[in-house]
A protein has these predicted regions:
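Conserved alpha/beta cores of soluble small-molecule-handling proteins
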Residues: 1-124
Length: 124
């Protein structure tokens, strides 16, 4: 989170995080598949591009560049020893100010990865 790798059970946000109260966040839902040559993130570049476009539309400048987000995604998968997983990059207005005007709240970035079978269940 915000450039640091945080153990799953230690990841947290402040209770007054702006996004929790006003929904000021954007995210992507991405799959990583196990292949013969190792884990493969489905359309990583396209998902990162869409995340940045969504952030721009919401006036949330991402404090990292696109390549840093792509590489952080790959490193997060590797550090968690996953070969097939779900990826949730999230850009959100963090703790620091409350109220309807969000532009003074800092922009935070998190990338979560976890094992997840078939999206619609094993038969779907």
């Amino acid at each position: 989170m915000n450039g640091e790798f945080v153990p799953w059970d230690e990841a947290q946000v402040h209770v007054l995080t702006h996004a929790l109260h006003y929904g000021t966040s954007v995210f992507e839902g991405v799959r990583c598949y196990d292949t013969e040559i190792g884990p493969a993130v489905f359309r990583n570049q396209d998902h990162v591009e869409r995340l940045f476009k969504s952030s721009e539309l919401y006036y949330m400048p991402v404090p990292y560049d696109r390549e840093q987000i792509r590489q952080a995604t790959l490193e997060t998968i590797a550090r968690n020893n996953l070969r097939s997983c779900y990826i949730r990059p999230l850009v959100f207005r963090g703790y620091g100010t409350m109220g309807l005007f969000p532009l003074e709240a800092r922009v935070d970035v998190a990338i979560a990865v976890w094992e997840w079978g078939a999206y619609l269940g094993e038969e779907g």
